[in-house]
Amino acid sequence: MGVGLSTLEQKLTEMITAPVEALGYELVGIEFIRGRTSTLRIYIDSEDGINVDDCADVSHQVSAVLDVEDPISVAYNLEVSSPGLDRPMFTADHYARFQGEEVALVLRMAVQNRRKWQGIIKAVDGEMITVTVEGKDEVFALSNIQKANLVPHF
C-alpha cells in the first residue's frame, strides 16, 4: 500500500493493481488531484520501459474497471504515464530500490521548521527513511511525506 495515500487513493490502488499487473506492468502509484476538473494519474512501469501504446492499453483496461466500480463521484480525467526521470516515490520499497539516489521531499508537517528537503536516500527502516542532507542524516516518517520525487541529473 502506498505511503500517505488518501482513502480514495488506497481504494483505487486496490481496485486497479490486478488489471494493470495482468497486462504485464507494474503499478508504480496513483495520484488523485482534486480541482475544477479532477485528475486521476496512474504511473506504470515495466522492465522494457513504457511507450504510448502501453499507456493506452492500461488506460482502456482501467477505464473499464472504473466504469463498472464507479468509485469517483466527481468528473475527472484519467492520465496514464511512465514515472519519468523525476519518478514519484509512493512506497517504502521505492525508497529502498533507489537507495543512494537523490530525492526531493515535501512533508505534511514541518521538521525543523522545514517542509521541503532534498538529499540522498541513505536507508529505509520500516516506516522511516534516512536522507543525507548537506552531509547530515535526517530521519523522516514515511507517513509524513506528502510528495517525493527522484531528482534527475543530466
UniProtKB/Swiss-Prot annotation:
Matching Pfam families: DUF150_C (PF17384), RimP_N (PF02576)
GO biological process entries: ribosomal small subunit assembly; translation
Gene3D superfamilies in UniProt: Ribosome maturation factor RimP, C-terminal domain (2.30.30.180), RimP-like superfamily, N-terminal (3.30.300.70)
Subcellular location per the Swiss-Prot or TrEMBL entry: Cytoplasm
Any one cellular-component term (Gene Ontology): cytosol
Domain of life according to the entry: Bacteria
Keywords: Cytoplasm, Ribosome biogenesis
General function of this protein: Required for maturation of 30S ribosomal subunits.
Similarity annotation: Belongs to the RimP family.
Protein name: Ribosome maturation factor RimP
Species in which this protein is naturally found: Salmonella newport (strain SL254)
Gene: rimP
